[in-house]
């Protein structure tokens, strides 16, 4: 997992905008008595698509004036839908394949028609590649409803939705606060995870007419609903969109490093709605039935190419990502559905856990839609399973914030039958952590801060550290040793010089070992060995949470494992560009000072000092000085 520029390898290297809302496959409001069947409120399919071949037959396209992809897209909409009122949706971007994606929302009297959209795809040559259209073409309202305001108020709409859908929301005593001209927020409600909102908008109906509605948004956990209540009649709900899709994944559950540690399970809705509120199968523009969503897009990539959007990915009926797999199956392509599913699952869990620990939108995480939380969006992780560009490895490319990360998981040929890296969670976690460290060190806009030998080595070490911390088992102690990459490499020794261990007889590495090392993975093994010592010092002091997520008390994880993961992550953001071991150690100490007021100073110092990075340690690229000393207050 090499950190040169954008590549890393295991061994070498504001609001939700619904452009084309597609309801989830959920058929009812989850987990409640008297639940309403949401299939009754699905939005009808109205969109058309003009392909590239069809576009070439349209002579008017040739007359388009040259300009930016936004100008070209806007001109197309003007020519295709003359005299229509519309606005540009603020989520346009150019994908890594060079296609400019632009979306427009139709409006009437300045009010959105919420299910009337026009999306334009502009190629690298500046010409329209294709477009989709669901603009409303029926009769327009004769007058602006904002003039007479002869519609129900938003509070009536909220009460109407509560009653019609049997929602567990109480609004007695609630009041309305304006957010914009057509949107309000309800304050003082209970039963929802966030304050409900209502937006005045039109909905194009299946019968060809237009309805003025209040779009009431209610997040009740198992369901996140956009309910379109008729603005003239408070008992009529026209449509409902549920952001929450109920899906099952057959995978090796989080915490199992590889197939030798357990059996596959079927897990329902594995996402965390606090960190992935759109779930893993939606980006706020579309809900998907394949391995694609806000955080990642996973697919089969046998030719090893860079084009991914049209590659194969599993898309099961009823969102049941349940596919057969056994390590004895051969050839690997026979279980590609299971491989893509596993890769998608592990990477999304990484997203959710790292988000909890601080790798959020502002920090430069990987998401298409940042929902107004800061940072730059349009940068999910592209996940290529059984990538044909190599073997016996895996890698991760980390461009600056706003550009997608890319992970390639290869087939390993050191066993018979070959082994698929997607099924070794430790490998995938290591790769994803390259994205974490490269975005945090130097800031989201600079992915060039882990490219010196020692800092590049730490990039490898962080990947091993997080992969190892995640795989700790309930009965593990500081005497437990772990190897890295043992399963994929078909070797009990794994792919590192030594196992990760607190026993100096098992792993003798110290800071001055770096004087004889000139390769990032070897140096990374030294760094992770030090972090493993710190990890167990903190676990011995605070205990170990064996659950899949941390428990915070006043912003601090209440156990040693997640505390170590938190302060190591915070240290990445604190340290300078291209740090050395001494600077990174100090950054972790500073992170603990900031988080706990230095309550763990001695545990951290003792962990580093045991491995020669004590008080007197000094960096010199050719002659590092080691030290086992700790501050006087820690003796």
From Swiss-Prot:
Induction: Expression is strongly increased during growth on protein-rich medium. Expressed at even higher levels when keratin is present in the protein-rich medium. One of its GO terms (biological process) is proteolysis. Zn(2+) binds at residues 430, 434. Glycans are attached at residues 287, 475, 594, 623. It is an enzyme of class 3 (hydrolase). Its EC number is 3.4.24.-. InterPro entries: FTP_domain (IPR011096), Fungal_virulence_M36 (IPR050371), Peptidase_M36 (IPR001842), Peptidase_M4/M1_CTD_sf (IPR027268). GO terms for cellular component: extracellular region. Secreted metalloproteinase probably acting as a virulence factor. This is Extracellular metalloproteinase 1. It comes from Trichophyton rubrum (Athlete's foot fungus).
